[in-house]
A protein has these predicted regions:
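Hydrophobic packing residues in well-ordered alpha-helices of helical domains and bundles
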Residues: 25, 44-47, 51, 65, ...
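Basic, alpha-helical interaction scaffolds
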Residues: 89-157
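Short linear motifs embedded in intrinsically disordered, charge-biased segments
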Residues: 164-297
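Short, conserved non-catalytic motifs in the polymerase core
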Residues: 1-6, 35-40, 93, 105-107, ...
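Mobile genetic element proteins and their domesticated derivatives, centered on retroelements
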Residues: 3, 14, 30-32, 54, ...
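Catalytic palm subdomain of template-directed nucleic-acid polymerases
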Residues: 32-56, 161
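Short, conserved micro-motifs composed of acidic
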Residues: 63-97
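Active-site palm subdomain of RNA-directed nucleic acid polymerases
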Residues: 4-35
């Protein structure tokens, strides 16, 4: 595992070559993303200059980018859609790309990721069904939780669906799984979940959201809470109820995608949690208490 680490160290000075030119530069292993808000030709020129500087940086280190794998994604309805080049070659434009295991689209809607996750999970579930003809509830549920459900829940804080169709696309996989279990009395999905002690996938996504909010606000990990949330008490229009130092403020958004973005969709649910639970220090204790709270409602 030393090779990947040495490679990351080797490319760590890429930022120096494009410093001051971009709004966004993100690296993960050998994947690099450059981003810039482009509304005029000057913005386009800055982004193109960053691409040119990146190519010069690679040449200095005796490397070259695989231009055939480099893509441009134009986001926003008013995006002018300029053409960009690397090493004299025009970059291909794409509306959909996989980024660290998640399908990202130009519209930023999660439908493509939901479809991919459901398809992968269905394939694994089918393999389990063929391998186990008698599906004892204890054994089969352990297999489902370990091999199927993770595909439906990977990084959902980044792409949690909000439309009924996308939610159903994921939930149908779990519904199929519980119908495979032998010995259950009811044919009703919700009653089968109750017999098996399983929550819906939507409920698990909600609890995962709250757990992530707690981690960010407690300063765990690399995310800066001030970049994600605004404290309601800091607002100039704070009321007596919103002045609770634990409460967050919803940032106004005109578009549906903005209203359902993680930092907005979690606010009301977070503010509804009793203060004594939100003040819990350890993440695992918070998750346990919040799970109990949801079960009691």
């Amino acid at each position: 595992m030393l090779g990947p680490l040495l490679f990351v160290i080797f490319i760590n000075d890429l930022e120096d070559s494009v410093e001051g030119l971009l709004d966004i530069l993100r690296k993960f292993a050998d994947d690099t993303k450059l981003g810039q808000e482009v509304t005029r030709e000057e913005d386009r020129d800055r982004l193109q200059q960053a691409l040119d500087e990146s190519c010069l940086w690679a040449e200095r280190w005796g490397m070259q980018f695989n231009v055939s794998k480099c893509k441009v994604m134009h986001m926003g309805t008013s995006n002018p859609g300029y053409q960009y080049h690397m090493g004299g070659q025009a970059l291909e434009t794409t509306d959909e790309e996989r980024d660290i295991g998640v399908m990202i689209t130009a519209s930023l809607k999660p439908s493509a990721q939901c479809a991919k996750a459901a398809k992968t999970a269905q394939a694994v579930l089918g393999q389990l069904a063929r391998a186990f003809h008698y599906r004892d509830r204890h054994v089969f549920m352990r297999l489902y939780k370990q091999y199927v459900r993770p595909h439906l829940e990977f990084s959902t804080q980044a792409w949690s669906p909000w439309t009924a169709g996308d939610k159903a696309c994921l939930e149908k996989v779990q519904e199929r799984a519980v119908r495979m279990v032998s010995g259950l009395k009811s044919d009703d999905y919700s009653e089968r979940l109750s017999e098996l002690g399983l929550p819906t996938l939507e409920e698990r996504r909600h609890q995962a959201d709250m757990a992530m909010v707690h981690k960010i606000l407690c300063g765990r990990g690399s995310l800066d809470s001030s970049q994600w949330f605004e404290r309601a008490a800091d607002s100039v229009r704070a009321t007596r109820s919103s002045a609770n130092p634990l409460n967050l403020k919803v940032r106004q958004g005109r578009l549906e995608i903005r209203r359902n973005f993680f930092s907005n969709r979690v606010v009301n649910s977070w503010n509804d949690i009793p203060s004594d639970i939100r003040e819990t220090v350890r993440s695992e204790n918070f998750q346990r208490k919040y799970k109990q709270l949801r079960a009691s409602r």
